[in-house]
Amino acid sequence: MADVYIIYAKENRATALKVRDYLSASWSVWLDDFIVGDFNVAIKESIQQAKCVVALYSSFASKPAVTGELSLAEKYQKKIIPLLLDDSDPPYPYGHLSSVDFRSWPGAIDHPTFQLLQKKIGLVVAPRAKPARLAATAGGALALPNVFMSVSSHETQFDPVDALSALRIHATSSILVSAYDLIHSQSRDAMVEEIQTYRDNGGFVLIDSGNYEAHRLNDTRWKPAHLKKVLLNTPHDWAFCFDNMKPSDKFDVAVRQVVRAVERDAKHTSAPMLPIIHIKQNEAGLARLPRIVRAISEQLRPPIIAIPERELGAGLAQRALTVRQIRDELDKLPYYQSIHLLGTGNPWSIAVLAAAGADTFDGLEWCRFAVDPSSERLHHFQHFDFFRAKRLRTDLMDVVDADEDIGYAGKVAFHNLEYYGEFNRLMREMYSTGDTESFALGVTGLKSVELRKLFPGIFL
């Protein structure tokens, strides 16, 4: 007995197959691939036994084969969820059903359109398994898990425009840029030019709200209008909303504050606007957090939901446990919701928090510290001399070492970027095969028994 039966015209078979493949991660799905015996009998029995019907509506859906199956679905009182594939009228007389607009669906499982379908099916029949971790998001443009290389003027070794230049030259896959610097930097025009060139070369740009810098500098004049200006004048793929740094301690109000912030800032960009959640820094705040994240996911269905790592608990063990609690709550949804941790660039932290259930991270570590690739530990920037001989042997680093015009800071930065590029690649490769613990063991150098003792419930 299948959970979901898909009705479609043969002209829409490619879409039907993709929908079937994606839904099969959480439900049993019937498609007419493997009919044995009488075709009509098999269809009638399968519709009768199915718990939910998904029907593809297009200009081809008025064919008798489609309307006949719709008639059977109504006869057996099945819940029918139409997917509108084009601008044609629904097949008569089945235009009264609540539908999902698939006309602009790009074919990605993490798209809000497909998540709405998953949510509707979940109201009829519960998923058989928790949603599968995504291998990519943003329509495949951003592989997961992922560490964004951040750019900021606050306590880093580089002016933002120089940092952007290094990231462009390195061809780093994804970056996070603070809106604060895109307003206050004297080089903001050059920054925008660097960002445009970076995107033209295939890079992925995430704009941050700028509240991190404003908070650190005690700048009370930083307002949503500043972010609006940045969104209107800076090329980007995603943007974080102007987050509310003083959240309510009431559940409903806290959720509403985040949703309103996203809706306000989304008016100024065609790119996805992403929520940032802050919580009261107490036991009650941490206890509410998983439910708040889930509620915001259900209302907005954003590509990612961001939470500052520093607000997840006092130590890494507590933070990992909080992430796991959030993931457990999100796993009750019929679709996968990705989590972003703000300010997480330490390799050891990433290895543990990704295993706990986080998907994307960002950090300034690449332009603040020097990474020892053998221990995967961070050191003072000037301590690069202790392990520069251990650097990754890559063509880029050979060029960097040979170029006398690249100063000490530049050599450290490119060394770090090469490290994080390989870190990202290896993390994705091992996560694709479920080797989350093996990845953490490799990064930290700990033994399995030590890792499990330190982080109970994360590594089993």
Predicted regions and their residues:
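Short beta-alpha junction loops
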Residues: 59-60, 84-89, 209-213, 244-246, ...
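Glycine-rich phosphate/ribose-binding loops and adjacent secondary-structure elements
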Residues: 271-399
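Conserved acidic residues
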Residues: 51, 173, 237, 303, ...
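C-terminal extensions of enzymes
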Residues: 127-155, 159-161, 393-460
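A cross-family glycoside hydrolase active-site/sugar-binding cleft signature
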Residues: 7, 32, 147-150, 176-180, ...
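Non-catalytic, usually N-terminal nucleic-acid engagement modules in DNA/RNA processing proteins
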Residues: 127-270, 428
